[in-house]
Each structure stands twice: as structure tokens, then as C-alpha cells.
């Protein structure tokens, strides 16, 4: 009995439309997969992970405040994807200094300056403790969204910080201005406001009119900028 003829094989060139279409599909999938990974999965561990595009595009980052160190800055642990990607229930956030080492960003609140605490033997400004306690109560141990604007000379990420409260999403810098525990940043070279400078100044003017916080000091008020020039720069 003669053998059954084998099915003829098709010699497909790498330039065949089917091959080109498949290659294009794989390449596209890899490209968008990588973009998705960078945007929603990859953790930003330190300021060194912040690419120029993240800064230039003011890419929002979601994360957890692990520590408030001063009246206008805090430590931020990036949790990309938030609850939907398991943070807080499947993926645990470190709690010890050892485990958090080289895993957080130091965030400097944009557009504002809080009273200086006691550092290096220098005295503390009035309302520095109140500002620190207020910020701790407001953001410490909570999730926030930051919008990075720049990295300052101390390797801090100057950013807008927003947090959800029962009354809606709040701008942390704006809330500090409202209660008079910060003033609008006076420096020119490193000032970052996003699109909020006019709004911040209006909030400051209202707090000043109502003599909130530091504005209750009246003529005895030394702004944080003036205080730093006197005590840290010898002016």
C-alpha cells in the first residue's frame, strides 16, 4: 500500500505578513507591558529612581507616610497601585528603620515654609512644635499622593502632597497655610508652587488677617526664611 502523502509544509519567510504581524503584536505588548510596569508596578525607592520624565511630567505617586521629621517634610514609601496591588493587605509596608533604609523619599512640601525647630544648638521658633504636631496628626501613618516638582540641594523631593479626608481631597500645603502653621515660601531660586502660587498667597493673607498661628505674633514674627538667614548663615 502506498504511503499516505504528507501535508505539504509552507516555507514562510521572516518577511511574510503573518510573521510581521505577529512580531508587531509581540513588540507592542512588550512595549506597553514595560510602560505599565514603570507607571504602575515599579517602586520608586529613593530620589535616585526619579527619572527626568517623572519630574518634568509631574507624575503623581501614591504612597504611605512612614515618618514626619519636621514641620514641612516627611518620609514617603511609594506603594504603586495602592490597595488594588495588594499594599496594606498582601504586601506589607516596612515599619523598622532598618527595613526602611534606602526605601523612602524625603518629601519637602512645596510652596510653604514652617517655623524652624531646634537644630544644631539653635533655638526653636515659636509655633515650630505646633506645626510639627499638626503635620504628624494630618499625614503620619496615612496614604498620600505626591506630585514631584524638583529635587533640592538636600536631596529632598519638593512636591505637592494631597490626602483624602472625609470632606474630600486636601492639599497639605494649603491646609497648613489656613491654620497659620506655615507661610508662603520666601526663597526665589528653589521656589516650587505648581499652579498654586496665587491660591497659596490668598490663603496666607486670610490666615494673617485672622491672626492664625504664627500670625498671632504680629510684629514679633520672624519668618522661617529670616530665621535661617540669621541663625544658619550668620546674617
Swiss-Prot record:
Membrane-spanning parts: 15-37
Active site: 108, 116, 156
InterPro entries given in the database record: SNase_OB-fold_sf (IPR035437), Staphylococal_nuclease_OB-fold (IPR016071)
Record EC number: 3.1.-.-
Topology in the lipid bilayer: Single-pass membrane protein
Annotated keywords: Calcium, Endonuclease, Hydrolase, Membrane, Metal-binding, Mitochondrion, Nuclease, Transmembrane, Transmembrane helix
Gene Ontology MF annotations: endonuclease activity; metal ion binding
Pfam families with a match to the protein in the record: SNase
Source taxon at top rank: Eukaryota
Gene3D superfamilies tied to this protein: 2.40.50.90
Top class in the EC scheme: hydrolase
Binding site for Ca(2+): 113
Residue span(s) of domain TNase-like: 59-217
Any one of the GO CC terms: mitochondrion
Subcellular location: Mitochondrion; Membrane
Family note: Belongs to the LCL3 family.
Protein name per UniProt: Probable endonuclease LCL3
Organism: Candida albicans (strain SC5314 / ATCC MYA-2876) (Yeast)
Gene: LCL3
